[in-house]
Amino acid sequence: MGPSSPTSPRRSAKPRPPPGNAMPTPVVAPSLLAADHGDFAAGIRTIEEAGLGWVHLDIMDGHFVPNISFGPQVVAALRPRTRLHFDVHLMLSHPERFVAAFAQAGAERLTVHVEADHDVAKTLAAIKDAGLRAGIAMNPDTDPRRLLPYLDSVDLALCMTVFPGFGGQAFIPTVLDSIRFLAAERTRRGGDFRLEVDGGVNAETGLLCRAAGADTLVAGTAFYKAPDRRAFVAGLTA
């Protein structure tokens, strides 16, 4: 992907409004990265059939993380097929270059990394100016205090519970301390941003994240491989 912003078709289906921040149960957002890459539309249908309202879209550039996934053209192609809330996670070196493209493609939320090579405050402002919800993400070895300057201006804080780049990795339990820190900070500030976790989330680790304060769980491999996906989701949201 280059720095230019491609022209994407306008969405033809009105997206479902995202759930509010004050929810009695957590949100499960399956990662499309774990679906069949030859049939993303089927992966979307699987999420809908499980009764869920969000899909997590991992965007990787091969620079910020050692893998490449897909870009705004794929997001735009999926947008008319579903009303799912598009939770787009930009694992890009220069995410500010792609805000307009993903907004036009149909994203409702863009999350960028605090470690990426960009002016974080300006990028978050650009996301909001585009009419989207803004999120800030951190890697497992990042000090959660780096997120403090941005928590009052985001709708979501994302703790990576694996090192980003590939699905199917093992959960890193030390990140639970970062989740607890951010949850306590949210309470201290009286904030309402969502606290999301991504990586190695399954029936066991998802409950650990919930207990630590997370309310938005990105599940990939565990969701798509579950023999009963509705039961899997119910186990995380009970």
Which residue stretches match the model-derived regions?
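NAD(P)-dependent Rossmann-like dehydrogenase/reductase catalytic/cofactor-binding core
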Residues: 2-22
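Active-site beta-loop-alpha junctions enriched in small/polar residues
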Residues: 31-35, 60-62, 91-95, 115-117, ...
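A structural motif
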Residues: 49-54, 107, 154, 214
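Glycine-rich, proline-tolerant flexible connector loops at the mouths of alpha/beta enzymes
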Residues: 55-72, 162-170
